[in-house]
Amino acid sequence: MTWIRRCLTLTMALLAAGAWLPADARVQTSPDADAERAVRAIVAEQAEAWNAGDGRRYAAHVSPEVSFTNLFGMVMYGAPAFTERHVEILSTFYKGTTKRHVVRRVRFLTPDVAIVDIDNELRGVGAMPAGIPTPPDGIIRTQLMEVFTRRDGRWVIEAYHNVDVKAR
């Protein structure tokens, strides 16, 4: 019983200690600060490519085997499918939209594997494809999780999973 009480006390102390952290607190478990900068630079490059309407550039850092789930629940695999989809959407219903993002967390599972949580906002969204509601304010908010790995010194996106977030 004493052991259980100690475990519960320690758990509560750890939870209380973390409660004061802001929601956007960065988690840095990589011994290599350059790794985090490199991953963040790719996320920034994605936003630049999106805002330029360049689907190929947006997909430049995905791995050949990327796992991709979009905010409509479509699941695709592989760099060609990811690239084709982004070329298509940036030339049709997302043409002219502006992507803004906030990196909420970069967490390194190992020095060569990082999970990045990103709050996305697409502004200027107009008519959507049939069956998909058009946001009345022209803004789509999503939570994007990207999983990066370092291959031969180069960071690539292994998984890209995007979900719709309703306004709070």
What positions do the PLM features span?
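Bacterial N-terminal signal peptides that target proteins for export
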Residues: 1-11
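Bacterial N-terminal signal peptides
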Residues: 9-19
